[in-house]
Amino acid sequence: MHPLGIIVNPMSGRDVRRVAARASISAHHDKQQQVTRLVLGALQNGAQEVYLAREPFRISERAVENIAEKTQIKMLEFKLKHNAHDTVTAAKRMWAAGCRTFIVLGGDGTNRIVARTCPDAVLLPISTGTNNVFPQMVEASVAGAAAGLICSGQVPIEENCYRCKQVHVECDDGTTDLALVDAILLKNDQLGSLLPFSASNISQIFLARSEAASVGIS
């Protein structure tokens, strides 16, 4: 039996693709309602403790303010940097607290950060981003219940959870990284370009999975 960690990326589903690709917005209120259902589903199906982390928009804090089981909910506080490092810190703190199962609300990038930080964690990825391949659209109550069953040991990890493929990257300077979906080598790229538009700039593609129904490059 181990605690459940829930990590929310407040900025997922809110980038420039709302303009460039007419993508839908993942509102903070929607995420808040999802977190409420996740926590209730987990606690009612065996989880004894749920760890959350404060973020700038107080999504997690507001999600649990009216939940009766306050003693079973732990809210982590740390100095925010308002970038991806906050996800790293939350994952490390939750892992240190004993969390071995994580529900991640975000996109491919958020899940990549958690997988890189805690490579032996069980991830239940819920899509709140855009053009996601790794996380899935799933009802939060069902996801919470599944996580509760895993955390409580009622559903054994070894028999019901599988390890996903990864692409491991090593750069010339010795730094390493990993991808859960794809690693793309771009030519004529510019520093700070987070949304490459031209397919002619794609030099090489390394895929962990190839699915006809999945959209875009991660």
Regions found by a protein language model. Name each.
Residues M1-T101, R116, P156:
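ATP/NTP phosphate-donor binding region
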Residues G5-V8, A53, V104-G106, P125-S127, ...:
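Short beta-strand segments
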Residues A68-K70, A121, A140-G144:
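Short, hinge-like loop/turn segments at secondary-structure boundaries
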